[in-house]
Amino acid sequence: MFSTAILGVGVSLTVPLVTRAIIDGPVTRREISLLLPLGLLALGLSISEVLLVWMRRWAQSKTVSDLEATLRHDLYVRLQALPMEFHSRWQSGQLLSRVTSDLSIIRRFMGFGLLFLVINILQLVVVTILLLRLYWPLGVVVLVAAAPIIIVSLKFEKKYLAISRRVQDQQGDLATRIEESAVGFRVIKAFGRREHVKKQFDDGAVKLYETSVDKVRLASRFWTFLEVIPNLTLVIVLLLGALAVGRHSITLGTLVAFITLMLSLIWPVESLGTILAMAQEAMTSADRISEILDTESTITDGPDELVNPRGHLRFENVSFRFSPDSDDVLHDINLDLPPGTTLALVGATGSGKTTLTALVPRLYDVTGGRITIDGHDVRDLTLASLRSAVASAFDDPTLFSMSARENITLGRPDASEEDVQQALEIAQATFANDLPWGLDTRVGEQGMSLSGGQRQRLALARAVLARPAVLVLDDTLSALDVHTEALVEEALRNVLAATTGIVVAHRASTVMLADQVALLQDGTITHVGTHGELLATVPAYRTLLAAEEEEVHA
């Protein structure tokens, strides 16, 4: 790519020198016999330049496309590898803008700006040397004219970098608002907050518009300056050059070659503003992307594989905090779940139930103690083997914009049709067979074409289909009516009998699925026993279940 570009510059700069030879030779001396070979040489150089431009563009497009694809792949893989802690701190719109608009900015610079930055600098240096060799007084005039351009360019670079960063950050904020409005449109309509949300969007859009106008205004002033200086220099060179020809200091051919070479500098100089602007935007985009690529993942693969897991799950003095300077959310957690045991986790809202269940598949890592499966610390296991042994279904089910079948088989793509139907029956999700195109029906983004209960049942079917050694159900029955819940619970008994289960429960009927019940209060397990034992001996447990039942039936 660069080699063809450099050759192209060399060929284009040779043409004015051939023109000088034609004017000062055959034309001035009227030697027609020399005109044909020199003319053919000029024609050959022009054709060569065209071919080199074609080769450069082909190589340029392929190289840049490959680079963009590689960067996008690396960025996506990195986003998938980063832990929940990272994603909880970042707005999805900011991440989206980095994967899309920032990569496009880098692609444009690598495909156009970087190449021409190198070519133009090379051309400026070579042409300046040629101008000085052709007639040094006029060459000095060109050099003097370049000084203010360099000074202004350096000042422009600093200002443009700062304003480009503001524009790109505001684009990310606006993308976040658009995404949140699209995902939460039902809530917006239900509460009649369309105008309120629209005003928030308009405020962000106006802010972005004003910053973008400031950016264009700054660039326009710089580009105008770059237009004026070369044109003034051309006028001066024409005047002084004509005088030099009149005094026979240089030949007419030399003046024509000088002016032709000088005119070849106009594009590099005029494009300097555009290229520097692109460079600053690309630097800003690269910095924004580096914020993701350079983030260290705190949750990484361990050295061991979990082979033929039995599901013996233990919590040993487990504690957890979200950040080093925060208080413990969980502390002194000790539980022992032999294979095939189901534990119901009961606690008030905010007591840490969801956080505790998230520690098992290492969505977060414990900050104290350890969790083991079959005697292996989960931190010593590869993430693939751990998460194939642990399946989770959450109270807020996530479905993807794909078919119902693809959503269900996400954790087990090779599942047979019989296994899929069995999982649907257990989760009471056979309604999926009655969708317009059956299981091949696309459920829309976040599964918005389905009801809350339907989404929850599909998510439960997905977890059941995975056939894990450890099954974590984080209040996955909360959106079901009493009748459907009873049917699901009856089917789940058979599933839980063959696996180790943790069930976050708010209703007595769900608690009855478990062999043991653990009461979580103030971030720690205060009581463990059967439902009957806790109901008889722990007033706080009775009060909590009674309150939950009243809320359900209210």
Predicted ranges, named:
Residues M1-L7, L41, F112-R166, L239-I250:
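Transmembrane helices of ABC transporter permease
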Residues M1-V15, V27-L38, R56-Q60, V64, ...:
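Membrane-integrated ABC transporters
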Residues F2-L52, L132-P137, H248-L252:
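Transmembrane helix-loop-helix hairpins at lipid-water interfaces of multipass membrane proteins
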Residues T28-P37, L130-V144, L218-D287, I292-L293:
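Helix-loop-helix
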Residues L45-V64, L115-L122, V141-D169, A219-F222, ...:
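Alpha-helical transmembrane segments of multi-pass membrane proteins
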Residues S65, H73-S97, S101-L103, T176-Q200, ...:
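Short intracellular "coupling" helices and adjacent cytoplasmic loop segments at the cytosolic face
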Residues M84-S88, S101-M110, L114, V118, ...:
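An intracellular "coupling" helix at the cytosolic face of ABC transporter transmembrane type-1 domains
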Residues D301, V307-A554:
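ABC-type nucleotide-binding domain
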